[in-house]
Regions:
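Ubiquitin-like/PB1-type beta-grasp interaction modules and other compact soluble beta-rich domains
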Residues: 1-82
Length: 83
């Protein structure tokens, strides 16, 4: 796995999200700070946020308004299913 470059974040998409976007992993520079996970989602042009989506920062589930720091890994996750 690659790490985020200084001043940037590593963004991961899983399952249907990566299928829709056409990519699984991307490094994104943080031009302004502070920035939230939701703002990263919006800057990537991934469509409207849905309350069924989940976001993890550094492998911990957080709310979309959680602040992102340079070097963080953001993972956007589709709705969980199964039983």
């Amino acid at each position: 796995m690659s790490e985020a470059e200084p001043g940037s974040v590593r963004v991961l998409l899983f399952a249907a999200l990566s299928d829709q976007a056409g990519w699984q992993e991307r490094t994104m520079p943080l031009a302004a700070q502070p920035v939230t996970a939701l703002q990263v989602w919006q800057a990537l042009g991934l469509g409207p946020w849905s309350s069924s989506l989940r976001v993890a920062i550094n492998q911990t589930l957080v709310e979309p308004d959680h602040l992102v720091q340079p070097g963080d890994e953001l993972a956007f996750l589709p709705p969980f299913t199964g039983g």
